[in-house]
């Protein structure tokens, strides 16, 4: 639209998770935790083959724990639309499918699940990281937690304002928030339904 025509095309996104002063891709001593971050990619794979979690546990001969990171759906959807160059309405449908599959996966699996809301993590990274380490049975060292916290953004990126939303899109998001328990935290955010786009 004309309102957003001046915005640059998003660059290919890359994130640097290197922790200052710590080993990246190397280890000293026994490995306690192996993890990966794939988000929608993991959901898509599990939607295609629900036995993958069991197969992974059988391969590594260790329990597989799930860390479910949730971001405000409006910001998620806007980012998805900008990265793919598609309309918000298309990504609303995609996001709804992801929620459907995540709900099914969480209902059907026996794995432990640790839930993190993106906004809480950014506002209190040290506390969330400490809680996660404790949940994973890892030692909690203040220097390590401080180093991990140092690479976290200072505030959430409210990317919802960078896309054009139609009334029906916002109504669909509100319906999803009401339906899915893991999105309920965002029910009180009135900007989902009414935001100044002038």
Predicted feature locations:
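PAPS-dependent sulfation machinery
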Residues: 1-54, 58-59, 183
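PAPS-dependent sulfotransferase catalytic domain
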Residues: 55, 60-143, 178
């Amino acid at each position: 639209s004309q309102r957003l025509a001046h915005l640059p095309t998003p660059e290919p996104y890359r994130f640097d998770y290197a922790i200052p002063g710590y080993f990246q891709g190397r280890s000293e001593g026994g490995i306690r935790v192996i993890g990966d971050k794939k988000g929608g990619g993991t959901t898509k794979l599990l939607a295609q083959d629900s036995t993958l979690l069991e197969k992974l546990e059988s391969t590594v001969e260790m329990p597989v724990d799930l860390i479910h990171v949730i971001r405000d759906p409006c910001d998620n959807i806007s980012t998805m639309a900008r990265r793919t160059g598609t309309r918000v309405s298309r990504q609303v449908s995609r996001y709804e499918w992801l929620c459907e599959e995540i709900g099914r996966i969480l209902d059907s699996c026996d794995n432990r699940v640790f839930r993190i809301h993106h906004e809480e993590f950014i506002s209190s990274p040290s506390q969330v990281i400490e809680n996660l380490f404790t949940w994973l049975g890892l030692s909690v060292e203040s220097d390590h937690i401080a180093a991990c916290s140092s690479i976290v953004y200072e505030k959430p990126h409210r990317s919802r304002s960078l896309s054009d939303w139609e009334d029906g899109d916002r109504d669909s998001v509100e319906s999803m928030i009401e339906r899915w328990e893991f999105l309920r935290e965002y029910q009180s955010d009135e900007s989902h339904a009414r935001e100044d786009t002038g």
